[in-house]
């Protein structure tokens, strides 16, 4: 597939997702980095987003809970270019009923080449990167060209 560029803005749209056993870890991470995160637009799956808002006061667009379609909502927004960064603390030691949705979410984040953190270390690397508070160009699939080729 051909690629094109997309600009991630200075004020990023960040999706925050955490499985049940990881919610406390994500909440602690958000609290540690609250001063940086409040400069960005935050979205989250339902329970996670409501917990973050309740504990920090940060404005969070809370979607549905992951098992009820929230992971797929985040994935759709990634495909539409509406999410710039995904922080997803998933639990590798416990299966969840919506494992296919989890795989799909991670696949879409990879297809659309957005920064993804699945653990504390990577989340810290992303938020401490000089790119976090500046605009940056990324390569993404050139969907209009892809579609035009398929419709020939």
Curated annotation (Swiss-Prot):
It is an enzyme of class 4 (lyase). Catalyzes the formation of methylglyoxal from dihydroxyacetone phosphate. PROSITE patterns: METHYLGLYOXAL_SYNTH, MGS. Residues 6-152 form the MGS-like domain. This is Methylglyoxal synthase. The gene is mgsA. The active site is at 71 (proton donor/acceptor). Keywords: Lyase. It catalyses: dihydroxyacetone phosphate = methylglyoxal + phosphate. The keyword Ribonucleoprotein does not apply. It comes from Enterobacter sp. (strain 638). It comes from the Bacteria. Belongs to the methylglyoxal synthase family. Coiled coil: none annotated. Its EC number is 4.2.3.3. The keyword Signal does not apply. It holds the Pfam family MGS.
